[in-house]
């Protein structure tokens, strides 16, 4: 009956700019736009809906209540890290290696927390 998450929505003061950021920096494709809302799709089919926000929001902190980060899976951590670095992305720390998994936190155009990850093996 329940098949999983179809998409996740992010409210942005500038939905178009944020959709374009995901396309330019993370290879998402802007595949649908209506009335100022944008759907962007990752290579694995994951979708984000970017909707207009009413006003600005202070950048989230790691331990605030609510959704804290979106994890972006990569198959070449070093290449992805270099790509983001060359694009001037704001990193929220240094790359880490935890239990064989390589990870790095960074921020999108609006300051939302993203998590780059290359797993040694898939989650169970």
Model-derived segments and spans:
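Conserved acetyl-CoA-binding loop of GNAT-fold acetyltransferases
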Residues: 24-31, 88-90
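Short, conserved charged micro-motifs
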Residues: 17, 77-81
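Vicinal oxygen chelate
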Residues: 39, 81-124
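Conserved active-site tyrosine of GNAT-family acetyltransferases
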Residues: 18-25, 84, 111
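Conserved short beta-strand elements that form part of the metal-binding/catalytic scaffold
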Residues: 29-62, 113-119
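Exposed loop/turn and edge beta-strand positions of beta-sandwich/beta-sheet ligand-binding modules
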Residues: 4, 34, 66, 100
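N-terminal beta-strand motif that seeds the catalytic metal site of vicinal oxygen chelate
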Residues: 1-17, 67-72, 120-124
């Amino acid at each position: 009956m329940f098949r999983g998450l179809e998409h996740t929505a992010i409210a942005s003061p500038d939905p178009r700019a944020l959709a374009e950021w995901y396309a330019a920096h993370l290879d998402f494709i802007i595949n649908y736009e209506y009335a100022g809302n944008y759907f962007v799709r990752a290579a694995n089919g994951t979708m984000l809906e970017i909707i207009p926000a009413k006003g600005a929001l202070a950048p989230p902190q790691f331990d605030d209540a609510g959704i804290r980060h979106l994890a972006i899976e990569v198959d070449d951590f070093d290449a992805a890290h270099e790509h983001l670095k060359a694009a001037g992305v704001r990193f929220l720390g240094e790359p880490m290696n935890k239990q064989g998994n390589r990870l790095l936190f960074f921020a999108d155009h609006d300051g939302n927390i993203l998590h780059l990850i290359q797993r040694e093996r898939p989650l169970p």
